[in-house]
């Protein structure tokens, strides 16, 4: 058996990300899922790029604020306390719009953990 308590404030925020990002996967010693905590100020996007995953399912639980998720068909508005799920091979770009009144904080879970599974998506290529 194994148990851990992780304080996200103890997890280092790496440079080079479009918003505040804390990977909880390693700190929680997780093997079967990836877990990340994000905080995006107005005008910041959550992922490094508009993308999809070939095998990984993703789930975003909004802890505070409102998350906007752009997809090829529409932009979803996900309020605080709600969950947004993404199937494999489904392009998305989670962000906090420039005209937002507040930051958005979310917990992102992906399974299976697949650090090299993300594929950049260009919405202009669908035309």
Regions picked out by a protein language model, each given a short descriptive name:
Residues 1-34, 120-127:
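A short, N-terminal "cap"/entry segment at the start of jelly-roll beta-barrel domains
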Residues 72-89:
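Short acidic-glycine-tyrosine-enriched beta hairpin
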Residues 23, 35-39, 59, 83-85, ...:
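Conserved hydrophobic/aromatic beta-strand scaffold that supports enzyme active sites
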Residues 38-40, 52-71, 109-111:
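Short, conserved beta-strand element in jelly-roll/cupin
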Residues 69-70, 86, 92-100:
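Short beta-strand His + acidic residue motifs that chelate non-heme Fe in jelly-roll/DSBH
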Residues 20-23, 36-53, 88:
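Conserved short histidine dyad/triad with adjacent acidic residue
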Residues 97-127:
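Double-stranded beta-helix
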Residues 30-31, 41-46, 66, 112-114:
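Short, charged/polar surface micro-motifs in flexible loops or helix N-caps
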């Amino acid at each position: 058996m194994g148990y851990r308590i992780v304080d996200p404030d103890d997890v280092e925020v790496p440079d080079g990300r479009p918003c505040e990002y804390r990977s909880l996967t390693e700190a929680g010693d997780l093997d079967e899922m990836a877990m990340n905590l994000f905080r995006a100020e107005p005008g910041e996007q959550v992922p490094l790029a508009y993308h999809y995953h070939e095998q990984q399912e993703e789930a975003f639980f909004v802890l505070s604020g409102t998350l906007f998720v752009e997809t090829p068909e529409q932009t979803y508005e996900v309020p605080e306390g709600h969950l947004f799920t993404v199937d494999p091979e489904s392009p998305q770009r989670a962000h906090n719009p420039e005209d937002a009144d507040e930051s958005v904080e979310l917990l992102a879970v992906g399974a299976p953990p697949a650090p090299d599974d993300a594929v950049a998506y260009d919405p202009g290529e669908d035309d």
